[in-house]
Regions:
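Ligand-binding cleft/hinge of the Venus flytrap
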Residues: 24-31, 97-98, 113-127
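Central regulatory/effector-binding core of bacterial HTH transcription factors
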Residues: 2-67, 126, 133
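A late-sequence structural motif
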Residues: 15-19, 165-197
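Flexible hinge/capping segments at coil-to-helix
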Residues: 1, 66-105, 191
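Hydrophobic residues within well-ordered alpha-helices
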Residues: 9, 50-51, 100, 141-147, ...
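A ligand-binding cleft/hinge motif common to bilobed small-molecule-binding domains
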Residues: 44, 61-68, 122, 136-164
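Secondary-structure junction motif
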Residues: 61, 103-123, 187-192
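Short beta-strand->loop
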Residues: 70-80, 131, 151-155, 162-176
Length: 197
């Protein structure tokens, strides 16, 4: 427990909420003198912070695109259909993408970080989205009020307080969340932290 220093982690809300707290708790039990800073951003910001040395580690749901970066898989996050509780899809065993494409779709995106549209494109479908936001809780509230349907990652839905139905998608698509870091100069504390993931 002689390790000191600070670990700066670039992350987004569902990882900060559902993945990191138990890891930090375990790490802190062994290394009480290490401090933490969590920076919240979108995926390209997070990767940029790690590349520039602003953050020691980052979490993004894809591979890093920059040079000199390494990644290790952290968790598989299934993508789920989110529909109003009174929707005909609410009781479906699995929801086909085609059924969602016919509804008013509320899209989770920020800048270029859109994991959902490619899902439809690969299936040869076009998604009709009149509403898009980066706030997953806003999406759940809108679905609850009958404004449309959406697809959200299971991690986000883990503590869903809204009156919506969450159903598996046909084919069970998922995203891979990775821990990313610079290969050249990852700090001792950050390297040790990676072992706790």
């Amino acid at each position: 427990g002689l390790m000191r220093g600070k670990i700066c982690i670039g992350t987004f809300s569902s990882v900060a909420t559902h993945v990191l707290p138990p890891v930090i708790a375990r790490f802190r039990a062994d290394h009480p003198d290490v401090d933490y800073e969590l920076l919240m951003g979108d995926y390209s910001e997070i990767e940029q912070w790690v590349a520039e040395g602003r953050c020691d580690l980052g979490f993004i749901p894809r591979e890093p695109r920059g040079a000199g970066m390494a990644s290790r898989p952290l968790v598989q996050d299934e993508l789920m259909a989110v529909v109003p509780a009174d929707s005909s899809l609410a009781t479906a065993e699995v929801v086909p993408l085609a059924d969602l494409a016919n509804e008013q779709f509320i899209l989770l995106e920020r800048g270029t970080d859109d994991e959902i549209t490619p899902l439809f494109r690969r299936a040869g479908l076009t998604v009709r989205s009149k509403l898009s936001t980066w706030d997953d809780y806003a999406i759940m509230a809108m679905v609850e009020d009958g404004l449309g349907v959406s697809i959200l990652p299971a991690l986000i839905l883990r503590r869903c307080q809204f009156d919506v139905a969450v159903r598996p998608l046909e084919g069970h698509p998922h995203r891979q969340i990775n821990a990313i870091y610079r290969t050249a100069d990852v700090s001792l504390a950050a390297a040790r932290f990676l072992e706790y993931l």
